[in-house]
């Protein structure tokens, strides 16, 4: 049994817009799963359907075995949703937002209060418990929405751009919290524009584009498709004529001199870093520090999306041709 199982999901709005043309997803229990795609790909529609906020046109959705068509109440009780927008009463006190949310799920106030205290402390909001929501910063509001989504102890937590507009320090603390609850058994689905976030947190990934699933695999398998990575090396002393960057030993590497103290080197993923640094040292080059220039997930993401768009244009052309032929017939 999967935490989330989606098959042939389609959605056509009353305007005629086809938001989803066949999305298939399987999310294992206990997974930390990334759902990515460019703007307009269908991510928000998919999340809306899974959360019970949008009606599907076709296909099936199961949450921990509960089919939305036959057991919607049970399916929805398994889900906690953190949407992009701040959709709570800005003039309500923080603690009351959480306790009242618990009431929607039949949780007695004393029990809801204890849960609220636990999450507010973990998310560093306890000292704000009696503040109005409107008095919170953007980052605090994001954390409040996570606490609200967790108040009924859902098995599946869905986060739609949870760290948008949040500074780096708060983002890191949110990552730590989400990693902790995932290790405790909560299945998490994350959509984000911060691809570093997906790469750091998620075990598995699906990419949606033009309303279709174009990739559904493990993060490790996806990243293994990269052949090269590019690094910026900062040197202890300037490059001079005694340094042989064109030596036979360094020939497998693509080396560019950015300035007298900086090199850009592209290496094959199977080459060893230790071997590279030994070769540089042997050729009189001492490295002070380095950084990875390649955003690996972004590189793969763009490659897959570009490939899919070419395929989508072909599919749509064939579908239109078939439709025209049927009308003529």
Feature locations, PLM:
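ABC transporter nucleotide-binding domain
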Residues: 175-267
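A short, flexible loop at the N-terminus of ABC-type nucleotide-binding domains that lies
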Residues: 1-6, 11-22, 72
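Conserved ABC ATPase "signature" region
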Residues: 99, 103, 110-128
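Conserved ABC ATPase signature
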Residues: 132-136
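Conserved catalytic motifs of ABC-family nucleotide-binding domains
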Residues: 153
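Conserved ABC transporter NBD signature motif
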Residues: 59-67, 74-75
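Catalytic Walker B motif of ABC-type/P-loop ATPase nucleotide-binding domains
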Residues: 157-160
